[in-house]
């Protein structure tokens, strides 16, 4: 008798971590952070393209992009390199330690620099990754006329974008969307499904 507890999962490829695999089970306990039909994540490469196009269009403005320190930061670095972006990417100090660990494990992220080593007011069309909370604190005010973005599945919700005063919402998530939750449940073929982190009405 097998019980499978999913934890957070996604089915899309991510070169910075092990891939998803199906496991047949009798009871499947799945997370459902984005367990509503309105959540259908776009392709990662299309969201990265939006970021790169914004850099070209707003070539005198630094791009401050909010990412979580564990996993999301390194995934975005990897996706940017896969998209052909080979410029130095700047990281808030809070992102450096975990990123250095990923590098020590062989994850390819290209050239990065700690923003604490720089005169940030001189940065123009560069990409600067930081924790989401840093977008609106004292640290962010050191940049001149930045474009602010957040990388999150929640950027699918206009109210969230407006609430956080974000100019560049990027919908890249480490959680399965509605369709992938349904597909995973079907493929695991459990007798019973229990759901966490979701909306009861779903």
Put a short name on every predicted segment.
Residues 1-71, 82:
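His/Asp/Glu-rich metal-coordinating catalytic cores
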Residues 1-18, 50, 58, 67, ...:
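Core dinuclear metal-dependent hydrolase active-site scaffold
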Residues 7-9, 32-34, 70, 94-95, ...:
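Active-site metal-binding loops of divalent metal-dependent hydrolases
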Residues 14-16, 38-40, 97-105, 123, ...:
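Short, charged, surface-exposed secondary-structure boundary motifs
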Residues 27, 61-64, 88, 125-128, ...:
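Residue-level preference for the first positions of well-ordered beta-strands
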Residues 48-61, 67-125:
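Hard-cation-handling environments
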Residues 184-195:
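Proline-aspartate-enriched helix->loop->beta-strand connector
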